Amino acid sequence: VVAAYPYGSKTIQSSYERIPGYIEKVKANGVEITSSIADLLEKVDCVLLETNDGRLHLEQAVEVFKSGKICYIDKPVGATLGDAIAIYEMAEKYNAPVFSSSALRFTPQNQKLRNGEFGKILGADCYSPHKVEPTHPDFGFYGIHGVETLYTIMGTGCESVNRMSSDRG
């Protein structure tokens, strides 16, 4: 990481409270802080779009896609299904590589399960942490972790999924 543009949500507390500390940490590691995505794009080969507010991702991603640079979008891809679909349509329009995933897909244990090291997997109980964020629907923030684990282990042939939640956190 050579440069960063530290713009995040102005309405999600877990975003705006952390950004000043993140800026200091990355600056201490020699990362240049830029004043815009346009300035950032002049300095990097690819973009890690880490804004935790999916409502901003479409606008931010389109700017990256127009540059043709590779873009990784952290969860949630978009705040709504419509935003997520629009993001992938815009990536296709600009022929820009885009990727989003939970890091849990790549954990050694999940890869061993996926690769059959413990035999054929017939079913899975997968859990995700969940923090309610009123600006995003349902499991928008953390649901990806359980879904990625499920599909990493089971593949794309999953026939049914049940979900549950608890008010105990």
Residue ranges of each PLM-predicted region?
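Rossmann-like dinucleotide-binding domain that binds NAD(P)(H)
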Residues: 124-169
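Short aromatic-enriched loop/helix-cap "lid" or pocket-rim segments at secondary-structure transitions
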Residues: 13-17, 112, 136-139
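Short, contiguous clusters of charged residues that form electrostatic/catalytic patches at enzyme active sites
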Residues: 35, 42, 55, 59, ...
